[in-house]
């Protein structure tokens, strides 16, 4: 699970009176791994990458099968998949964009990173009274889109984009961070700094508004 170390590895602290008993899913070098409270491997979905992995009711897991490579890539995943307990893909999305990197054949990709949510849950996985759907429903996916917006910078940008995808893989709604540049309240000094260097990552572009997660909101009782 890590580099050789003189420090203890595995489960190093387990206070049964204070720790809620259950299972932990985490990404390992081998794939999506499920362990018990003592660190014993309960299940391994070999080769299922993460960004992240989320367990759904019925023994399903969501993740990705691979990442975009090369100097034009920045954290882009090829797809978002749902696999069953045996690792068979039962749902897949990879049609955010047809990516044509120089010197490579064009390929459709999800360009997903960091977060996604399946309908029925505000976080993307099960919790009491919040059960994500496993055989239907829409999925919100955090993705990237390269563009130019001269209000932000004259450099090529890596924009944060949220898309909503139905069960058949159709994009039915989208939201881009760059369309809301005036809303965070950047002062002139911050805007000037962003314009000169919007978080550049070489040929991939400037990651000007790095988004890690999002959540849907419940109904407003007012």
Q: Which residues are covered by each model-predicted region?
A:
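Histidine-/acidic-rich catalytic cores in large beta-rich domains
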Residues: 1-222
């Amino acid at each position: 699970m890590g580099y050789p170390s003189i420090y203890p590895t595995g489960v190093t602290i387990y206070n049964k009176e204070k720790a809620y008993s259950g299972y932990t899913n985490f990404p390992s070098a081998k794939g999506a791994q499920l362990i018990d409270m003592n660190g014993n491997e309960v299940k391994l979905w070999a080769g299922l990458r993460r960004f992240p992995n989320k367990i759904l009711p019925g023994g399903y897991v969501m993740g990705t099968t691979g990442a975009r490579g090369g100097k034009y890539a920045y954290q882009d995943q090829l797809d978002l998949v749902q696999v069953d307990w045996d690792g068979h893909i039962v749902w897949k999305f990879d049609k955010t964009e047809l990516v044509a990197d120089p010197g490579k054949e064009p390929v459709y990709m999800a360009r997903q990173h960091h977060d996604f949510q399946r309908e029925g849950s505000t976080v993307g996985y099960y919790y009491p009274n919040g059960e994500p759907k496993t055989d239907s429903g829409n999925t919100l996916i955090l993705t990237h889109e390269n563009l130019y917006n001269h209000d932000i910078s004259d450099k090529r940008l890596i924009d944060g984009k949220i898309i909503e995808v139905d069960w058949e893989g159709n994009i039915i709604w989208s939201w881009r961070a760059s369309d809301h540049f005036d809303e965070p309240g950047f002062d002139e000094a911050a805007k000037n700094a962003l314009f000169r260097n919007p978080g550049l990552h070489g040929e991939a572009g400037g990651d000007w508004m790095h988004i890690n997660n999002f959540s849907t909101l419940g109904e407003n009782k007012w």
